[in-house]
């Protein structure tokens, strides 16, 4: 059994690949796949977003190379940003 961090990394990889490739490139998330992933894995984050275009905005921000899809590296940027925000929130309120 790996460390907590190794397990977290494996989970991140598995979550990405569980949602990618249903509509094309198996190494990227389409807009629909990203939306499904966010609804499944980060539903409380989406619930807080009152903006109906939240997924479109997230997709636009993440898609650094402009190909209309989110690759693993671009996805990790989202997870890292959310993790930093959560860290700041939880440590400031503890």
From Swiss-Prot:
<dbReference type="GO" id="GO:0008016">
    <property type="term" value="P:regulation of heart contraction"/>
</dbReference>
<feature type="binding site">
    <location>
        <position position="69"/>
    </location>
    <ligand>
        <name>Ca(2+) 2</name>
    </ligand>
</feature>
<dbReference type="GO" id="GO:0042802">
    <property type="term" value="F:identical protein binding"/>
</dbReference>
<dbReference type="InterPro" id="IPR011992">
    <property type="entry name" value="EF-hand-dom_pair"/>
</dbReference>
<keyword id="KW-0106">Calcium</keyword>
<dbReference type="GO" id="GO:0051117">
    <property type="term" value="F:ATPase binding"/>
</dbReference>
<dbReference type="GO" id="GO:0005794">
    <property type="term" value="C:Golgi apparatus"/>
</dbReference>
<protein>
    <recommendedName>
        <fullName>Protein S100-A1</fullName>
    </recommendedName>
</protein>
<dbReference type="GO" id="GO:0005739">
    <property type="term" value="C:mitochondrion"/>
</dbReference>
<dbReference type="GO" id="GO:0031430">
    <property type="term" value="C:M band"/>
</dbReference>
<feature type="binding site">
    <location>
        <position position="63"/>
    </location>
    <ligand>
        <name>Ca(2+) 2</name>
    </ligand>
</feature>
<dbReference type="GO" id="GO:0031672">
    <property type="term" value="C:A band"/>
</dbReference>
<keyword id="KW-0703">Sarcoplasmic reticulum</keyword>
<dbReference type="GO" id="GO:0031674">
    <property type="term" value="C:I band"/>
</dbReference>
<feature type="domain" description="EF-hand 2">
    <location>
        <begin position="50"/>
        <end position="85"/>
    </location>
</feature>
<feature type="binding site">
    <location>
        <position position="28"/>
    </location>
    <ligand>
        <name>Ca(2+) 1</name>
    </ligand>
</feature>
<dbReference type="GO" id="GO:0005509">
    <property type="term" value="F:calcium ion binding"/>
</dbReference>
<dbReference type="InterPro" id="IPR001751">
    <property type="entry name" value="S100/CaBP7/8-like_CS"/>
</dbReference>
<feature type="binding site">
    <location>
        <position position="67"/>
    </location>
    <ligand>
        <name>Ca(2+) 2</name>
    </ligand>
</feature>
<keyword id="KW-0496">Mitochondrion</keyword>
<dbReference type="GO" id="GO:0048306">
    <property type="term" value="F:calcium-dependent protein binding"/>
</dbReference>
<dbReference type="Pfam" id="PF01023">
    <property type="entry name" value="S_100"/>
</dbReference>
<dbReference type="GO" id="GO:0044548">
    <property type="term" value="F:S100 protein binding"/>
</dbReference>
<dbReference type="GO" id="GO:0042803">
    <property type="term" value="F:protein homodimerization activity"/>
</dbReference>
<dbReference type="InterPro" id="IPR018247">
    <property type="entry name" value="EF_Hand_1_Ca_BS"/>
</dbReference>
<dbReference type="InterPro" id="IPR002048">
    <property type="entry name" value="EF_hand_dom"/>
</dbReference>
<comment type="subunit">
    <text>Dimer of either two alpha chains, or two beta chains, or one alpha and one beta chain. Also forms heterodimers with S100P. Interacts with AGER. Interacts with CAPZA1. Interacts with FKBP4. Interacts with RYR1 and RYR2. Interacts with CACYBP in a calcium-dependent manner. Interacts with PPP5C (via TPR repeats); the interaction is calcium-dependent and modulates PPP5C activity. Interacts with ATP2A2 and PLN in a Ca(2+)-dependent manner. Interacts with mitochondrial F1-ATPase subunits ATP5F1A and ATP5F1B; these interactions increase F1-ATPase activity.</text>
</comment>
<dbReference type="InterPro" id="IPR013787">
    <property type="entry name" value="S100_Ca-bd_sub"/>
</dbReference>
<comment type="function">
    <text>Small calcium binding protein that plays important roles in several biological processes such as Ca(2+) homeostasis, chondrocyte biology and cardiomyocyte regulation. In response to an increase in intracellular Ca(2+) levels, binds calcium which triggers conformational changes. These changes allow interactions with specific target proteins and modulate their activity.</text>
</comment>
<dbReference type="GO" id="GO:0005654">
    <property type="term" value="C:nucleoplasm"/>
</dbReference>
<dbReference type="GO" id="GO:0005829">
    <property type="term" value="C:cytosol"/>
</dbReference>
<dbReference type="GO" id="GO:0030018">
    <property type="term" value="C:Z disc"/>
</dbReference>
<dbReference type="InterPro" id="IPR028486">
    <property type="entry name" value="S100-A1"/>
</dbReference>
<keyword id="KW-0963">Cytoplasm</keyword>
<keyword id="KW-0677">Repeat</keyword>
<dbReference type="GO" id="GO:0016529">
    <property type="term" value="C:sarcoplasmic reticulum"/>
</dbReference>
<feature type="modified residue" description="S-nitrosocysteine">
    <location>
        <position position="86"/>
    </location>
</feature>
<dbReference type="GO" id="GO:0005634">
    <property type="term" value="C:nucleus"/>
</dbReference>
<keyword id="KW-0479">Metal-binding</keyword>
<dbReference type="Pfam" id="PF00036">
    <property type="entry name" value="EF-hand_1"/>
</dbReference>
<keyword id="KW-0702">S-nitrosylation</keyword>
<dbReference type="GO" id="GO:0000122">
    <property type="term" value="P:negative regulation of transcription by RNA polymerase II"/>
</dbReference>
């Amino acid at each position: 059994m790996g460390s907590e961090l190794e397990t977290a990394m494996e989970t991140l990889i598995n979550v990405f690949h569980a949602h990618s490739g249903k509509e094309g490139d198996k190494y990227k998330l389409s807009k629909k796949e990203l939306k499904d992933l966010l609804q499944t894995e980060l539903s409380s984050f989406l619930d807080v977003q009152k903006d109906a275009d939240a997924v479109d905005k997230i997709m636009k921000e993440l898609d650094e190379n402009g190909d209309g899809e989110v690759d693993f590296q671009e996805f990790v940027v989202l997870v890292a940003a959310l993790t930093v925000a959560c860290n700041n929130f939880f440590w400031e309120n503890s």
